[in-house]
Amino acid sequence: VDMAISGLNKSDLILLAARPGMGKTSFALNVALNVAKAVHKTVAVFSLEMSREQLATRLLSSEACVENYRLKTGSLRETDWEKIAGAATILNKVDIRIDDNPMLSVADMNAKCRRIDSLGLVVIDYLQLMTSASGGRSGENRQQVVSEMSRMLKVMAKELNVPVICLSQLSRANEKRDDKRPMLSDLRESGAIEQDADIVMFLYRDDYYNCLLYTSDA
């Protein structure tokens, strides 16, 4: 991925889009962890869907190479404990700040990030859950709101001079096609997102649809 996009560049708005279940959050957390470890800067993660505890568990699972469900259920093997201890030591040395307030606007995030010294990366999970500056007045055109927020995210990336990775949901349009691979036209609720983003990346797993097809045929 680094070779394809030439790494994470300052002031870039990077859109990471996929259908639910493709691994957007896990991918973004891995990027966040790698940045925090490699450049020793603070990574701000705004999670509008999952709690701080859920994300912390995922980070620990990823670093320890222990299945997430084992951590959540406590069904750990004896060999897992040493891995977890080592991963916890590493995570304790990096500065990843998770804010799980589900009602944050772009302006709120910008203000919080400005108070962080040595900021290296911002991750937002995810665009369609964000609140507009007006607080979501009734009668608002959601497509216009999302378009406005994507523009504000680009402005934020430039003002903070750090890369901003924003996760986004896709519409169901790809599921109606024989070729399930996502396209720019599948971006949900906004035709302007691809104009504001410097990079648009899609996550796609062919086995996800093959598995569903096999199940339905059975």
Regions found by a protein language model. Give the residues of each.
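Conserved small/polar residues in nucleotide/adenosyl-binding loops
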Residues: 214-218
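Phosphate-binding P-loop
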Residues: 5-10
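Cytosolic-facing regulatory segments adjacent to core modules
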Residues: 2-3, 26, 30, 34-118, ...
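Phosphate-binding/switch loop-helix module in NTP-utilizing enzymes
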Residues: 97-156
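Substrate-engagement module of ASCE P-loop NTPases
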Residues: 145-164, 189-196
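P-loop (Walker A) phosphate-binding loop of NTP-binding proteins
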Residues: 19
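Conserved glycine(s) of the Walker
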Residues: 23
